[in-house]
Amino acid sequence: MAKKKKAKNSNPVIASNRKARHDYKILDTFECGIVLLGTEIKSIREGKVSLTDSFATIDEGEAWIRNLNIPIYSRGSWTNHSPMRTRKLLLHRREIDSLMGKVRDGNKTLVPLSLYFKEGRLKVELGLAQGKQDYDKRQDIKRRTEEREVVRDLGRRVKGIHA
């Protein structure tokens, strides 16, 4: 008999920005490439990257990601990169123009949501986001708590345990 192939996650997430999903309401998502140096890719493959407090901007028709922390490569030498440098995002012209219009219209921003490899290339999931107010965050927490309790009660009923 032939050996079965292992089910492999096609796009394993390297880093995700959970804080962004808590602080912002994500309206739309985009996949884009990113221009990196060799030592940056090596550091990312080691799992050393932080999306916290990073954001994207559009300047002079080009998309840039700022405050993306990629620590220096541990086995690098004088060729190491600057950890907090601004990096260029790769998007089609139509996407950049569309995002520029949406960001300029209202109180929206571009937030990186996750980093993952796709066919050997690093991709950034970029979200068009709108900031949440404190009461919105509290409502979300309350809604999640209620959903969790409903699931818990259903589990008890299925198991025959009455509360």
UniProtKB/Swiss-Prot annotation:
InterPro entries per UniProt: SmpB, SsrA-bd_prot, SsrA-bd_prot_CS
Single GO BP term: trans-translation
Gene Ontology cellular component annotations, sorted alphabetically: cytosol
Highest taxon of the lineage: Bacteria
Subcellular location field: Cytoplasm
Predominant localisation class: cytoplasm
Keywords annotated in UniProt: Cytoplasm, RNA-binding
Pfam families in the record: SmpB
Protein's UniProt keywords contain Nucleotidyltransferase: no
An example molecular function term from Gene Ontology annotations: RNA binding
UniProt xrefs under NCBIfam families: PRK05422.1, smpB
Stated family: Belongs to the SmpB family.
Function: Required for rescue of stalled ribosomes mediated by trans-translation. Binds to transfer-messenger RNA (tmRNA), required for stable association of tmRNA with ribosomes. tmRNA and SmpB together mimic tRNA shape, replacing the anticodon stem-loop with SmpB. tmRNA is encoded by the ssrA gene; the 2 termini fold to resemble tRNA(Ala) and it encodes a 'tag peptide', a short internal open reading frame. During trans-translation Ala-aminoacylated tmRNA acts like a tRNA, entering the A-site of stalled ribosomes, displacing the stalled mRNA.
Protein name according to UniProt: SsrA-binding protein
Gene expressing this chain: smpB
